[in-house]
């Protein structure tokens, strides 16, 4: 893999678009079988595909981006008051340079230029653990401008996660019922992102450095027209640009799914280079399933590592955290 390898446009040639309606709304077994095969092929080759027909209203997507812009337009000192470093369950604001998405074995790169903000399922303080607890809401934003549109979108994205997880299971030859316990109390972390314009000359610095996602399924919403996501295509040794299109989500598999499938399904390198000349917004939803589960896709796996243990280890590494880290 080379940071300077050629960059090509996707045009559905490398990373396919799959219509979820052909599986979930179809009465044709032929259509359902075709979707299952499309998912299987994409996961075997590079672990990335795009989806349409997902059921998330366009208006909810647009309100989500309006909320993003309202948040990140706040003065930096106000955003830092709700820093994720202040809360052991790690909700809230991430400033520029606070995360290094890139793992050192992928190369020597600077920390990410982006800003972020984590949201999750609302839980009371007496249930606090890593990834579990109350959300942290910016006090300067009205509920209708931020809290409500964000949580409305959160619930929509969570439902997409259930659909994609079912497709992964059936594409591996399992019945959907294998996920019954895994999806009962499924965890998902939503992350609002803002990337600055890529105006620097340092070749080791990116909006988000090349990395693989470490968890389960990522459901990425991109602000239409704000391109920047590039996916490494191993077979052709080049970067593939995935355009930001309205009402089309990018799905990719994380390291946890790759481990669960014994390396059969791929977790693939990707990066963000914001060439728009302005700010770029995106909202990934990291859908992990039951945090106390082990391997829902292989009942014969004898590993004792839980979802929570796996993602906590990876998260802490990216942010330079320990259980005691705080500002």
UniProtKB/Swiss-Prot annotation:
Annotated Gene3D superfamilies: B-lactam Antibiotic, Isopenicillin N Synthase, Chain
SUPFAM superfamilies: Clavaminate synthase-like
InterPro entries, A to Z: DIOX_N, IPNS-like_FE2OG_OXY, IPNS-like_sf, Iron_ascorbate_oxido_reductase, Oxoglu/Fe-dep_dioxygenase_dom
EC number(s) per entry: 1.14.-.-
Pathway(s) this gene product operates in, as recorded in its UniProt entry: Secondary metabolite biosynthesis
A Pfam entry, by short name: 2OG-FeII_Oxy
Residue ranges of every copy of the Fe2OG dioxygenase domain listed in the record: 183-290
One of the record's GO molecular function terms: metal ion binding
Function: 2-oxoglutarate-dependent dioxygenase; part of the tra gene cluster that produces terrestric acid. The clavatol biosynthesis cluster cla and the terrestric acid cluster tra are both involved in the production of peniphenones and penilactones. The non-reducing PKS claF is responsible for the formation of clavatol from successive condensations of 3 malonyl-CoA units, presumably with a simple acetyl-CoA starter unit, and 2 methylation steps. The esterase claE probably collaborates with claF by catalyzing the hydrolysis of ACP-bound acyl intermediates to free the ACP from stalled intermediates.
PANTHER family (alphabetical): 2-OXOGLUTARATE (2OG) AND FE(II)-DEPENDENT OXYGENASE SUPERFAMILY PROTEIN-RELATED
Family: Belongs to the iron/ascorbate-dependent oxidoreductase family.
Protein's UniProt name: 2-oxoglutarate-dependent dioxygenase traH
Annotated organism of origin: Penicillium crustosum
Taxonomic path: Eukaryota, Fungi, Dikarya, Ascomycota, Pezizomycotina
Name of encoding gene: traH
């Amino acid at each position: 893999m080379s940071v300077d390898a050629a960059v090509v446009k996707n045009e559905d040639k490398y990373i396919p678009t799959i219509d979820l309606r052909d599986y979930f709304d179809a009465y044709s077994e032929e259509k359902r079988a075709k979707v299952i095969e499309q998912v299987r092929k994409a996961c075997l080759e590079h672990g990335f595909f795009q989806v349409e027909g997902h059921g998330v209203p366009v208006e909810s997507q647009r309100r989500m981006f309006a909320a993003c812009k309202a948040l990140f337009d706040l003065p930096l000192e106000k955003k830092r008051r709700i820093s994720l470093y202040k809360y052991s369950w790690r909700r809230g604001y991430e400033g520029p340079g606070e995360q290094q998405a890139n793992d050192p074995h992928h190369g020597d790169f600077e920390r990410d230029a982006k800003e972020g903000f984590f949201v999750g399922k609302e839980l009371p303080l007496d249930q606090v653990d890593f990834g579990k607890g109350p959300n942290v809401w910016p006090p300067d934003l009205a509920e209708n401008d931020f809290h409500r549109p964000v949580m409305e979108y959160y619930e929509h994205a969570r439902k997409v996660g259930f659909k994609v997880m079912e497709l992964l299971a059936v594409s591996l030859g399992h019945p959907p019922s294998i996920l019954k316990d895994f999806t009962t109390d499924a965890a998902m972390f939503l992350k609002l992102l803002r990337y600055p314009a890529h105006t620097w000359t340092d070749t080791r610095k990116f909006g988000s450095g090349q990395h693989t996602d470490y968890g389960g399924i990522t459901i990425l919403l991109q602000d239409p027209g704000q391109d920047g996501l590039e996916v490494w295509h191993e077979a052709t040794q080049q970067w593939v640009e995935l355009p930001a299109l309205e009402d089309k989500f990018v799905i990719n598999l994380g390291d946890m799914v790759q481990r669960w499938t014994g390396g059969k399904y791929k977790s693939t390198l990707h990066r963000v280079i914001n060439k728009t000349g302005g700010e770029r917004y995106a909202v990934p939803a990291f859908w992990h399933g039951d945090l106390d589960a082990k391997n829902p896709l292989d009942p014969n796996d004898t590993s004792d590592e839980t979802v929570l243990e796996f993602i906590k280890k990876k998260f802490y590494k990216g942010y330079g955290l320990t259980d005691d880290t705080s500002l």
